[in-house]
Regions:
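Transmembrane alpha-helical segments of integral membrane proteins
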Residues: 55-56, 153-167
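Flexible cytoplasmic inter-helical loops of multi-pass small-molecule transporters
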Residues: 92-106
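Short alpha-helical transmembrane interface motifs in multi-pass membrane proteins
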Residues: 7-12, 81-84, 108-109, 148-149
Length: 195
């Protein structure tokens, strides 16, 4: 990979990993509501699911020419529906202001999110088909970069969770407002899938 291409790869992956998306918003919300330590299940579920999705993207990237557009479209709708459901759950979840302690989302719920998270699917397919496959079609490289993509995504999730933890007091004071803003950001993510 040339230095220019490598620079473009890092720019793309870091910007994509650090910008708002379902995982980062969920990580922020979980750490704000329950603290970083209590959010490790959420982060672990995201990380494992992310890795599996990146490996699946590696397989998909090998056969982009034969992907059925209807299947991709169906996946987009499923992802948007799940993201809107997640937004509703966040917007209506109890906060410390309400005097209630909401239960943190489970490992399996955050794991399942990855399989309908269109942002990370597009992230994986785009990175692999743009930066890796034109350079090499060696399976070891494609799998290795898929693992790297999952690690970069996990880094972004942890950064957002740490922000939620560090600003926990402020976010808890304005918990209802934060939940509504996060829910609206998720709805925006769902809409952006189609536009």
């Amino acid at each position: 990979m040339t230095p220019t291409l490598l620079s473009a790869f890092w720019t793309y992956t870091l910007i994509t990993a650090m910008t708002p998306g379902p995982n980062n918003i969920l990580a922020l919300n979980s750490a704000t509501s329950h603290g970083f330590r209590q959010s490790t299940r959420v982060l672990a579920g995201m990380s494992l699911g992310f890795l599996i999705v990146m490996l699946l993207c590696a397989g998909i990237s090998f056969s982009l020419a034969v992907i059925d557009p209807a299947a991709v479209h169906l996946l987009s709708w499923a992802g948007a529906a799940y993201i809107v459901w997640l937004a509703w759950k966040i917007a209506t979840s109890p906060t410390k202001e309400d005097g209630l302690q909401a239960k943190p989302i489970s490992f399996w719920a955050s794991f399942a999110l990855q399989f309908v998270n269109v942002k990370i699917i597009l992230y994986g397919v785009t990175a692999l088909s743009t930066f890796v496959l034109p350079q090499t079609q060696a399976l070891s490289w494609v799998v290795g970069v898929s693992v790297l993509l999952a690690m970069i995504g996990t880094f972004g999730n942890v950064c957002w969770a740490l922000a939620g933890h560090l600003f926990q007091r402020l976010f808890r004071q304005y918990g209802r407002q934060l939940n509504i803003v996060l829910a609206l950001l998720l709805v925006y993510c769902a809409v952006r899938i189609f536009y």
